[in-house]
UniProtKB/Swiss-Prot annotation:
A GO MF label: DNA binding
Keyword match Nucleus: yes
Assembly, per entry: Component of the inner kinetochore constitutive centromere-associated network (CCAN) (also known as central kinetochore Sim4 complex in fission yeast), which is composed of at least cnl2, cnp3, cnp20, fta1, fta2, fta3, fta4, fta6, fta7, mal2, mhf1, mhf2, mis6, mis15, mis17, sim4 and wip1.
Family label: Belongs to the CENP-T/CNN1 family.
Protein name: Inner kinetochore subunit cnp20
Keyword Nucleus listed: yes
Source organism per UniProt: Schizosaccharomyces pombe (strain 972 / ATCC 24843) (Fission yeast)
Length: 479
């Protein structure tokens, strides 16, 4: 009899629904939990796999294929594919329409085309060539001016166009009447010509201009004071009489003027030369009057003439120290009741400045004198160098034997070099702090960096230990 195994209720109600199968337990790794989304637990789909492969293939470079295409080539290909026929711009279309449509004479007179600088220059050169080729043509109908660069921008009937540097070709015409007719033909509505022989001071009024142009000499205060000043200033003033405040006329134009002629210029030159020749005699008379002392004395000028130069005086003082008497300082604190300069000084009582030879003799006497103070040596930081006695004491405290004088000299030079180096370091600290002086805090900081000062050793203890009483600074009293 075959035995049948029946599941008991206990076996059917096992804990498998709580623990889960083995395949389900594989999903629970230490980095994942039950609460992760199901999309992360799924396997990679074919679509996702293809996308990843495409991205990796783009990132990976194929070594056997030469990459000749650039982004610019791609843009060029796209533009050719999109726009097969070139589309004209609106500016080009308008210019092409203007070229094809014929213009009448009235339209040409109304619109004056703006020329570029190159075209204007070519027009200028063509005008010069025409004038040189046809000298015998009628000059009454010819245009005497040359077209300037700014001709299309303003009205051509302006007087300033005729007095540009290129427009001075009018000076070739000597006759003033012919030049007047030509100017009236070229400039409409001109009441008085610029080169008429009526008057040198006249008003040129143009109908189209808002501001009239005055043809006048210099201002009143400059013309009235022509006799004053130096001969050069008077000569410049006479020349400036024939210059307008707006433009300057050349001498070739002014030759036609009755007020400006060769005789007048010659007379002016002769008067100028006579005035220049009178200058030495005037100077001699001034010197004679100065000697006679007829002028009022100027104390500042006399003091400037008779005083030493400040720089030379400082150099002499730095070289030697003069011996002073005690009698000079007796009346130093008394008040000065009388003025410094009462009256002009006489020639006999004037200060006599010694010569260089006298100064050299005085300096040599002072150098040879036995009463000469010993010079003190100073370091770069403007403090006294340690004296040799202090260096000798320090050296004897460290050594048990006697020290020779040559060793002391070497020690002094070494101490000087040490102080120079420290002065450079301290000046760097002061510059960093934007100060011009070296303070005690800079020294303390430097000694801290050199491990000379610590919490156990202070600066005052080092001063008491190494510095003598003559060098050590006085103790600060605490209040």
């Amino acid at each position: 009899m075959a035995s049948h195994n029946y599941e008991t209720p206990l076996k059917s109600s096992s804990f498998q629904h709580l623990v889960g199968t083995l395949s389900q337990r594989r999903h629970f790794t230490p980095s994942r939990s039950r609460y992760t989304p199901r999309s992360a637990q799924r396997t990679v789909t074919p679509h996702k796999r293809r996308a990843l492969a495409r991205r990796n293939s783009l990132a990976r470079r194929r070594s056997n294929v030469f990459s000749a295409t650039t982004p610019r080539d791609i843009l060029r290909m796209l533009s050719r594919a999109l726009a097969k026929n070139p589309v004209p711009s609106p500016a080009e279309s308008e210019s092409s329409e203007r070229r094809h449509t014929p213009q009448t004479n009235s339209q040409k007179s109304q619109k004056t085309p703006r020329l570029s600088s190159n075209k204007r220059r070519t027009l200028k050169n063509d005008a010069k060539q025409r004038n040189s080729q046809s000298p015998g043509t009628d000059t009454s109908d010819a245009n005497l001016t040359i077209q300037s660069i700014e001709a299309p921008r303003r009205a051509p009937q302006r007087l300033s166009d005729f007095f540009t540097p290129d427009g001075r070709r009018v000076s070739n015409i000597r006759d003033s009447l012919i030049s007047e007719k030509r100017l009236e033909n070229n400039i409409d509505q001109v009441q008085e010509s610029a080169l008429s022989t009526a008057s040198s001071n006249r008003l040129i009024d143009l109908k189209n201009d808002e501001v009239p142009i005055f043809r006048i000499p210099l201002s009143d205060y400059e013309t009235d004071d022509m006799d004053d000043g130096t001969p050069l200033q008077r000569h410049v003033a006479t020349l400036n009489q024939y210059q307008s405040p707006i433009f300057n006329l050349g001498p070739d134009i002014l030759e036609d003027e009755p007020s400006y002629s060769s005789r007048a210029s010659r007379s002016r030159q002769s008067s100028l030369s006579s005035r220049l020749s009178e200058l030495p005699s005037k100077r001699a008379s001034l010197e004679i009057l100065r000697r006679e002392n007829t002028f009022p004395a100027d104390p500042i000028q006399e003091f400037g003439e008779k005083a030493y130069n400040e720089r030379e005086l400082m150099e002499e003082i730095s070289n030697f120290e003069p011996l002073l008497d005690d009698n000079l300082l007796e009346n130093a604190n008394e008040a000065v009741n009388s003025p410094v300069v009462d009256a002009p000084m006489d020639a006999d009582s004037a200060l006599e400045i010694p010569n260089d030879e006298d100064n050299g003799e005085i300096l040599n006497k002072l150098k040879d004198s036995p009463f000469k103070k010993p010079k003190r040596r100073y370091s770069k930081s403007s403090t006294l160098v340690l004296p040799e006695t202090n260096i000798r004491k320090l050296a004897n405290s460290y050594s048990q034997k006697k020290i020779a004088g040559s060793v002391i000299e070497e020690l002094t030079t070494a101490s000087e070099l040490f102080f120079k180096q420290i002065a450079n370091d301290l000046s760097a600290f002061a510059d960093h702090a934007h100060r011009k002086t070296i303070d005690t805090q800079d020294v303390v900081l430097l000694m801290k960096r050199q491990r000379k000062i610590s919490e156990k050793k202070s600066l005052s203890s080092l001063m008491q230990q190494y510095l003598s009483r003559e060098i050590a600074p006085p103790a600060i009293k605490r209040t």
